[in-house]
């Protein structure tokens, strides 16, 4: 008696090939969630995230985004326990990653930027504290916008797996938990094995 039929083996092999190709990408996958551990802290900036765009269409160029990033990067770093509003960032003497990311989010969103996410995660795999930045997906790819560290936008696919590791993201009223493609593939592999065992 054979423990596995050839059909089951081929299904498992095909599933592994498909899932391994998904796990080759460094970009995270975002899973919609009803809440995040940061929701209470985000109260002050919720109006920025939830505001509608004044622009009828996307009117944001990479040159303009890089200009805004440079302006925000030139603001001295100063940690704040609470999330500063964009107005507080623009008028204050210093701002941290949270304030700078939210200020850039507001500038871009007001000009109609789409596929824009405020991300909370780790700057590097060895980071002990969390960091905030934006991710912006356009036809040319996904860009990491970090006005605390960088003067210009960076293509996400050129950063590798050891930097800008997302944990949670906000896009308007939507909230997400990040799942790496490897974890996504692993969970779907387990689900695929359950299906294959039922054949």
Task: Label each residue range with its predicted role.
Residues 2-12:
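Bacterial N-terminal signal peptides that target proteins for export
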Residues 12-21:
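Bacterial N-terminal signal peptides
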């Amino acid at each position: 008696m054979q423990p596995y039929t050839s059909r089951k083996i081929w299904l498992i092999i095909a599933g592994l090939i498909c899932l391994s190709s998904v796990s080759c990408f460094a970009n995270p996958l975002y899973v919609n969630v009803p809440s995040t551990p940061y929701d209470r802290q985000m109260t002050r900036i919720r109006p920025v995230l939830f505001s509608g765009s004044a622009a009828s269409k996307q009117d944001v160029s990479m040159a303009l985004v890089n200009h805004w990033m440079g302006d925000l990067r030139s603001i001295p770093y100063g940690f704040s326990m609470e999330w500063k509003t964009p107005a507080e960032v623009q008028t204050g003497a210093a701002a941290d990653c949270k304030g700078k990311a939210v200020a850039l989010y507001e500038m871009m969103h007001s000009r109609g930027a789409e596929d824009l996410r405020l991300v909370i995660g780790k700057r590097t795999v060895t980071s002990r504290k969390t960091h905030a930045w934006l991710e912006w997906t356009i036809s040319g790819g996904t860009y990491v916008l970090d006005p605390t560290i960088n003067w210009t936008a960076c293509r996400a696919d050129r950063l590798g797996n050891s930097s800008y590791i997302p944990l949670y993201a906000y896009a308007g009223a939507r909230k997400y938990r990040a799942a790496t493609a490897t974890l996504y593939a692993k969970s779907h592999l387990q689900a695929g094995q359950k299906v294959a065992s039922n054949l």
